[in-house]
Every structure is written in C-alpha cells, then in structure tokens.
A protein has these predicted regions:
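Helical hinge/lid and interdomain linker segments adjacent to catalytic or ligand-binding clefts
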Residues: 97-192
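Solvent-exposed loop/turn segments flanking beta-strands in beta-repeat/beta-sandwich domains
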Residues: 5-22
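A glycine-rich, often tryptophan-bearing local segment used as a flexible ligand/cofactor-contacting loop or short
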Residues: 150-249, 299, 304
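Short beta-strand segments within Ig-like beta-sandwich modules, predominantly Fibronectin type-III
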Residues: 26-34
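Hydrophobic/tyrosine-rich beta-strand signature of extracellular beta-sandwich/beta-rich modules
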Residues: 47-53
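Extracellular ligand-binding/catalytic regions of CAZymes and related secreted enzymes
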Residues: 256-320
Length: 320
C-alpha cells in the first residue's frame, strides 16, 4: 500500500503511472483515478512492479517499486505462480514452523490421488492487505480446505467476508479450527455452543461418530488427546440448510479407562456440520476441532481421516 503526497496537496497530482519489469519510456501505463489495480495475464515467474506520479506542473516523482530489497518489512520477491487444480489447501498454522501439519494434510490428498490437483497457500502472520486479494486467491479454486492453528495466531476470522463471497460464488469451503473466534459467521449460522473440554482437554481414544456412515467414524489417537481448553461443539436450528456430520456421544463411564472422568461435555454435541444455504450457492463444512497439533494428526486414530476428505470431495462438494 502506497499513499500519494505532494507539497502542493494531493489535488495537484494529475497522473499515476505504473510499469511491470521494465521502466523504458514506452513501458508506462496510466493508472487513472482508481485506488487499486488488478493485473492479469502476467507470465509465471518473478516480476517487479514500478510506480511514479506526475503533478500539474509536469514534475515527476522518483520511481518506487516492489519488491524493494532495502525494505526489510516487506517480502523480497514477487512471484507469479500458475494455478494448478481446483483444490486449495490453506495453512493457517504459523507456529508449525516445521510444516508437519501441512505435510500431513498434503499426504491426505496425495493418498486420495489428488496429487497435482491442489495448491497450498501458507498464510504465515497476516493476510493480504486487501480483502479483494483474499477473495481473488480463493476464487481460483472450486474447493478450499482451510486448517487453523492448534496454538498461536490464526487468521480465518479476518477472512470472513472473503469466505462468504467465495461460497456465494458457488464454491465449497471446509475449515477445521481449535478456537471459535466468532459465532456470527454469515456463511455458517450457529445458534448455540457446547463446551466439550476444560483445562484437561479432550481425551485420547475418543470417537467422533459419523452421522452419515459408521465407516467414517473418526477417533483421537490411543495416546494423544487434544490438550486445549474451551473446545466447543455447536448447533444450528436451520434444519433445511444444516446437516450434522459428526457428533460425540456421552463421555464414557469406564473405570478401566485411564482417562475416565476427564471429559466434561453433556449430551451428544455436534462437532462438524455442513451448511448449504440454497441452490447455486456453495457448501460450508465446519469442524470445531483441530486436525493436527504440529507433531501428529489428532483425528486419525482409525486411519481413515482421508476417507472423510474423500466423502467431502465426492459427495458434499460435488458440483450440482
């Protein structure tokens, strides 16, 4: 983002010029009065964007550009990458510096034969400044699989407007999250929340019961739970648009279970559901539990998490 200034006031600026890769006399185009610019049909590879202005007296500014190697606060490269496939994996887990969660999530899609049909967007610490850029990145793909952080910052809530536009455009969206930062998602209405963990977390060897097919039941590993407090389940009363995909059953009461008495939820809370507002609009699937902690997967105790993803791709996210 660049702000235009002039000693005589911004009203004295008459022209804004931009160029890509070359600053020859014939290489400059006029930006006009629009506050932003979308570039299309750019060849894949590394590029440089140049900008300059001219005032009413005909004086031109110096040329600024991106990337600028002298600016350590910005990325030092701009690379255009061709879009491959119709699936986007969004890595919203910046604290996973070894990318263990990402490598596992990619392996799930590779196992399903989707190699070459997906791309990855690693968000790191912040989203692009413009919501238009976020929306554009999502809209290159028909299906988005977004996993939020187990611990540390996560950005999905800041992208809510773009996610809504993406779904309204007929595309499909899945998200797994550890913390429900907002319950007013317009793209996934929620009526009530249920606490399913306290300071002890969510125990190992606990089953998420599929409401579709028991072969899709998911389970936490034998020795690893989800050690986060304030995990939640959720409900939606919109029976015409909402369908539960996974519920918990009553916490087990087994004196031989080493984790007996730790789990605190009441009833059979929903932890994953699909929301489909109307024909012609895409579907949203919300899983209110994290899928990976940065060391190992958390819902693959049965070795079938990939089958759940296959179900989403082939059934829920199948084009109408």
């Amino acid at each position: 983002i660049w702000d235009l200034v002039d000693p005589d006031g911004v009203e004295s600026i008459t022209d804004v010029f931009y160029a890509v890769d070359d600053t020859c006399a014939e290489c400059w185009d006029t930006l006009g009065v629009v506050p932003q610019l979308t570039l299309t049909d750019i060849e894949p590879g590394f590029h440089i964007f140049y900008l300059k202005i001219r005032d009413i007296a005909g004086a031109e500014s110096s040329v600024i550009y991106f990337p600028d190697s002298a600016n350590t606060q910005e990325p030092d490269y701009w690379k255009v990458i061709p879009v491959n496939g119709d699936i986007l994996i969004v890595d919203d887990f910046s604290f996973d510096t070894q990318n263990n969660a990402l490598q596992w999530f990619k392996s799930v899609f590779d196992t399903l034969g989707e190699t070459g049909n997906y791309m990855v967007w690693e968000l790191e610490k912040e989203l692009p400044y413009s919501q238009a850029d976020v929306t554009a990145n999502l809209n290159y793909f028909k299906k988005v699989f977004w996993y939020a952080a187990y611990t540390g910052p996560e950005l999905y809530d800041n992208a809510s407007t773009s996610i809504e536009k993406y779904i309204l455009n007929g595309n499909h969206f899945f998200i797994s999250l550890a913390e429900m930062k907002d319950t007013s998602f317009t793209w996934f209405p929620i009526d009530s929340l249920v606490t399913i963990s306290d300071i002890y977390g969510f125990s190992p060897n606990r089953v998420l019961y599929s409401q579709i097919n028991s072969t899709l039941d998911l389970r936490t590993p034998d020795e690893t739970g989800i050690y986060l407090d304030n995990l939640i389940g959720f409900e939606s009363k919109d029976s015409s648009s909402f369908q539960s995909l996974y519920r918990l059953e009553f916490p087990p009461d087994d004196p031989y279970d080493p984790f007996n008495g730790i789990d605190v939820w009441d009833g059979t809370p929903n932890v994953c559901g699909v929301y489909h507002k109307q024909y012609g609009v895409g579907k949203a699937v919300l899983l209110s539990l994290p899928v990976h902690n940065g060391y190992e997967p958390l819902l693959d105790g049965n070795g079938n998490f990939s089958e759940f993803i296959r179900y989403l791709i082939d059934v829920e996210f199948e084009s109408e």
